Curated annotation (Swiss-Prot):
The protein's name in its UniProt record: Truncated Ankyrin repeat protein OPG003
Family assignment from sequence similarity: Belongs to the orthopoxvirus OPG003 family.
UniProt organism field: Vaccinia virus (strain Copenhagen)
Transmembrane portions of the chain: none
Gene3D superfamilies from the UniProt entry: Ankyrin repeat-containing domain (1.25.40.20)
Note from the entry: The N-terminus of this protein is hydrophobic.
Highest taxon, organism lineage: Viruses
SUPFAM superfamilies in the cross-refs: Ankyrin repeat
Length: 259
């Protein structure tokens, strides 16, 4: 066998050895990284589980893990029930491993339902990339309508990068369907939410607003002093000025005047 052939075989053997060795190292590091990440997720679950004395059914994994904290619900519970401390070890782990922009009922919506909600924490979360203001539930309603903390100031923070609400045309409808917050109604209307957006029964924002007024004053007729409903009239004028159709008809059929 010639010296050249022997040299070629040696080079091939060395190359094969290096290739296999580097592949092994790469896979080893990958496995170690995955195990490390799983270890940190387990740590998050452990901390949250040890701090929770009760787990509402809404946070169960579709009933599969009832009564248990899991990787699927741990971040939701953290942002809903915990006093979020941005300097804590737990917060840093959550930021590192949780999907802050999970579609549906996301960490953002959970945090806006937190009774210890803090605008400064919200700003930090947004700085970390939280961006799913417009997520909707299975019925097509905005999750933010369930918030305990939303007001004009919080809306400004959440929508700082959004020029208008034209892509969330039903936001005003959602709020007037479930809430009766005068200043926020103006805010959403002025931002561009469609006043003629209708639900499955063809009820528009104006229908719901008139229903709120009717129900509220019927139930409080003997408790309140005489009022000319100046504030309510102002909003009705405003929503009409922004294009609300006062002749919109529902499936019943009924108009705004018959609501």
């Amino acid at each position: 066998m010639s010296r050249i052939n022997i040299t070629k075989k040696i080079y091939c053997s060395v190359f094969l050895f290096l290739f296999l060795f580097l592949s092994y190292i790469s896979n080893y590091e990958k496995v170690n990284d995955e195990m490390y990440e799983m270890g940190e997720m387990d740590e998050i679950v452990s901390i949250v589980r040890d701090s929770m004395w009760y787990i509402p059914n809404v946070f169960m994994d579709d009933g599969k893990n009832e009564g248990h904290v899991s990787v699927n619900n741990v971040c939701h519970m953290y942002f809903t029930f915990f006093d979020v401390d941005t300097s804590s070890h737990l917060f840093k782990l959550v930021i590192k491993h949780c999907d802050l922009n999970k579609r549906g009922n996301s960490p953002l919506h959970c945090y806006t339902m937190n009774t210890r909600f803090n605008p400064s924490v919200l700003k930090i979360l947004l700085h970390h990339g939280m961006r799913n203001f417009d997520s909707k539930d299975e019925k097509g309603h905005h999750y933010l309508i369930h918030s305990l903390s939303i007001d004009n100031k919080i809306f400004d923070i959440l929508t700082d990068t959004i020029d208008d609400f034209s892509k969330s045309s039903d936001l005003l409808l959602c709020y007037l369907r479930y809430k009766f917050n005068g200043s926020l109604n103006y805010y959403v209307l002025y931002k561009g939410s469609d006043p003629n957006c209708a639900d499955e029964d063809e009820l528009t924002s104006l229908h719901y607003y008139c229903k709120h007024i009717s129900t509220f004053y019927k139930s409080n007729y003997y408790k309140l002093s005489h009022t000319k409903m100046r504030a309510e009239k102002r909003f009705i004028y405003a929503i009409i000025d922004y294009g609300a159709n006062i002749n919109a008809v529902t499936h019943l059929p009924s108009t705004v005047y018959q609501t």
